[in-house]
Design a protein with these regions (language model features):
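Non-catalytic, C-terminal membrane-associated alpha-helical segments of glycosyltransferases
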Residues: 261-332
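A short, conserved alpha-helix in the catalytic core of glycosyltransferases
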Residues: 181-184, 188-193, 198-226
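Glycine-rich, basic loop-to-helix element that forms the pyrophosphate-binding segment
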Residues: 94-111
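Conserved donor NDP-sugar-binding/catalytic core segment of glycosyltransferases
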Residues: 124-159
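Short beta-strand/loop segment that forms part of the nucleotide-sugar
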Residues: 60-68, 92-94
């Protein structure tokens, strides 16, 4: 039976400049930080936090990013978790919603470990096995920047192939991970500039994955290492989701594609709004106009942050659609 953990307090994401944060090195036997972003889903968050007992021996800290929840997450969190509370738990609160991307970046800056496991608040660990397998890949192969996991139900049964990072049935190289649960090499993510905060949520993992690929890194999918994704619909709005998906797809092209490709692809990506709206049965009056206005407002930021990837990176991105088998380097 564990003693009651200390719940650390942290202030707004804007309080401490990242440049002055120099975390002390962690114990070598605890190489993992777990980061969870949450907003207005306390019960779901509690379930996810309780599942972290599976990786407690590996974990240096658990950092919860409270993304402007109407009722702050921190008060009473330890009491609600009881003896299931992670021993080294901290809560970082942003008073206004900033988005998952900002939360993950803050977690990466706060962490002091080589590996960071990001979980959605509705993701649940079923055992330590998936995380241990992912850490083993990162430890053995310095070219790997991220490990993708398959989605499962609470019994460990895999969701359909279309809901996975790949249809592969063996360890494979893939384009991207799914944000619900992914393990990253912290230094690689920070060196790439982290998540694009302008995207907030939806498509942010694919955008980061492309930049990691452009930097020479690889992403490995482990199809036999499931993590449960008990997707919660709380707080979800179909029209807003449609807005985010289309806007972010266009923004990612504007930020990352070579100019000739962006000129051709941006109108196509923008026009996808209409078949998506019909296919989803969304009643979204004025939705297309909102997307266009949001893109216009983002143009100054796009001009500042735009950094096109290489054509060779885009060719490799297309090749990775086939999910070629992953062969780890020979052990020294």
């Amino acid at each position: 039976m564990r003693g009651r953990p200390k719940l650390l307090r942290a202030s707004s994401v804007l309080t401490v400049p990242a440049a002055v944060v120099t975390p002390a090195p962690p114990p070598t036997d605890r190489p993992l930080t777990v980061g969870i972003s949450t907003r207005n889903r306390r019960d779901v968050l509690l379930r996810s936090l309780r599942s972290l007992r599976h990786v407690e021996p590996l974990t240096d800290r658990v950092i919860v990013f409270d993304d402007g929840s109407d009722a702050p997450v921190e008060p009473g969190l330890r009491e609600a978790l009881g003896e299931d509370a992670p021993p080294r738990l901290s809560v970082v609160r942003h008073e206004a919603a900033a988005g998952v991307s900002a939360g993950r970046n803050r977690i990466a800056r706060e962490a002091r470990t080589p590996w960071v496991l990001y979980l959605d608040d509705d993701a649940v660990l079923l055992s330590p096995d998936a995380v241990r397998a992912g850490i083993a890949v990162l430890e053995r192969d310095p070219a790997v920047a991220a490990v993708a996991f398959p989605q499962s139900d609470e019994g460990g049964r895999l969701l359909p192939p279309g809901a996975q990072p790949s249809a592969a049935t063996e360890p494979s190289l893939v384009r991207s991970f799914i944000g619900f649960a992914h393990l990253v090499r912290r230094e690689a993510v920070l060196a790439a500039g982290g998540y694009r905060e302008v995207l907030q949520i939806n498509g942010e993992e694919r955008e980061l994955s492309l930049r990691l690929l452009d930097a020479g890194h690889r992403i490995v999918y482990l199809p036999d290492a499931p993590i449960a994704h008990l997707a919660s619909q709380a707080g979800r709005d179909l029209n807003h989701y449609l807005f985010q998906v289309v806007r972010n797809d266009v923004l990612a092209a504007m930020l990352n594609e070579p100019l000739p490709l962006a000129v051709a692809s941006v109108p196509v990506r923008l026009w996808r709004y209409f078949p998506m709206r019909r296919g989803w049965g969304a009643d979204d009056p004025g939705g297309f106009g909102r997307i266009v206005r949001a893109l216009a407002e983002a143009l100054p930021r796009v001009r500042r942050e735009r950094s096109p990837v290489r054509w060779s990176t885009l060719r490799e991105w297309r090749r990775l659609a086939q999910s070629p088998p992953y062969h780890p380097p020979d052990a020294p």
